[in-house]
Amino acid sequence: MTSTRQAGEATEASVRWRAVLLAAVAACAACGLVYELALLTLAASLNGGGIVATSLIVAGYIAALGAGALLIKPLLAHAAIAFIAVEAVLGIIGGLSAAALYAAFAFLDELDGSTLVLAVGTALIGGLVGAEVPLLMTLLQRGRVAGAADAGRTLANLNAADYLGALVGGLAWPFLLLPQLGMIRGAAVTGIVNLAAAGVVSIFLLRHVVSGRQLVTALCALAAALGLIATLLVHSHDIETTGRQQLYADPIIAYRHSAYQEIVVTRRGDDLRLYLDGGLQFCTRDEYRYTESLVYPAVSDGARSVLVLGGGDGLAARELLRQPGIEQIVQVELDPAVIELARTTLRDVNAGSLDNPRVHVVIDDAMSWLRGAAVPPAGFDAVIVDLRDPDTPVLGRLYSTEFYALAARALAPGGLMVVQAGSPYSTPTAFWRIISTIRSAGYAVTPYHVHVPTFGDWGFALARLTDIAPTPAVPSTAPALRFLDQQVLEAATVFSGDIRPRTLDPSTLDNPHIVEDMRHGWD
């Protein structure tokens, strides 16, 4: 009877410890994925990170998982100590990873230096995460928690906990850690969770496997690692602020990290600049050249309603409100953080345009809105497409045949669409790709370009759903403009031999050529 009771108690303890261990497995898996997502996010924010960079990072991480599983084999005979060491090192490296990469981007002059930090961080984190499962499997098969005969069931439980933890990490990063804490603090908090999980495993499970002195040493090491990450957490704001300022020549006066992008506003004297993910969007010294060239060719004298896709800074809306006869402006912007900055920090620049009763602001993805929007029965007299350069697949779809076909449904008969199309000099293939893509959606297109000192030679596309390409013209009712007039606009349609027109295959959702064009253009 006594032996039966003892066996039952042992079984109950085994189940309890197994649950604790599997919970720790899930926590460690969540932490491992968060570390990699943090590196991916930071690389994308600071370096643009397209599909090629993302694919290489993910592939490198997966390869490192396998390498870690192989390299840990000689230490399986000392699985308990090895597990504690792996978790301590992983917690430190993972917790510090975002701060280290941020510092590398900020303080290393050469891109190769920060790329090396990213590659090393990916390899180390992947290798350490890959070592976890073999170590845990070995511990589970030592008879105190599970028997060797249950190896298949044990492996299934480990995999289930591992994948469930990865799911939790994948959801926690974009919906909780990144928006609430930011990249550096989010990674640091994850490191603390990682080390705490290792501590739980050490206290409740490994005390039966290692000596008392070894356990105390391990716990002290974990505590020291926790102290290091906690110190980073306390000073993370100073680190981030100092590092961020290193990336910009002028003092930063506003910063947001939204669910979509990093937004920075700088000011030096009267020169105010807006950056999205490190890319300059406008400079107040010359933005009027860009904005006037974008807006006025698209609005005829009789235009009443205008759709603006992108342009959340409010500059296009500012100019539209100056044009007599405009009664309605629908402004579609993906990122509410951009709208918030436009209504506060940028209010003097855009003249409070987004708070004008004639402007209706919609927070939505431009393509999604076009697919499901309640377009006025008569359509819009003009559509202004003022979107970021298509240097990622997400942005590339907004420069596709399918996108322009959707925009056509929003145009009134005879209405005009204008698209900012990048630089015909710096990114000529991308520029002419956009022109060809718009034509593939059934438009007749007239390309034109102007000089914007901050950007250099910058191009646009004026399009209409007719067989005859529209002639760019400044409306006769236009207000007094600082830069654009009919003579300037006529000259803008002339392209020199080194940037002469060419016909290319259109960029589509299936084949987003434009993204690769942008990458090669700026390279």
UniProtKB/Swiss-Prot annotation:
Residue span, PABS domain: 231-465
Pathway where this protein functions: Amine and polyamine biosynthesis; spermidine biosynthesis; spermidine from putrescine: step 1/1
Residues annotated as binding spermidine: 313
Residues reported in the UniProt entry to bind S-methyl-5'-thioadenosine: 261, 333, 365-366
Catalytically driven reaction(s): S-adenosyl 3-(methylsulfanyl)propylamine + putrescine = S-methyl-5'-thioadenosine + spermidine + H(+)
Listed EC numbers: 2.5.1.16
Listed GO biological process terms: polyamine biosynthetic process; spermidine biosynthetic process
Note: Was identified as a high-confidence drug target.
HAMAP family named in the record: Spermidine_synth
NCBIfam families (alphabetical): MFS_SpdSyn (NF037959), PRK03612.1 (NF002956)
Protein name (Swiss-Prot/TrEMBL): Polyamine aminopropyltransferase
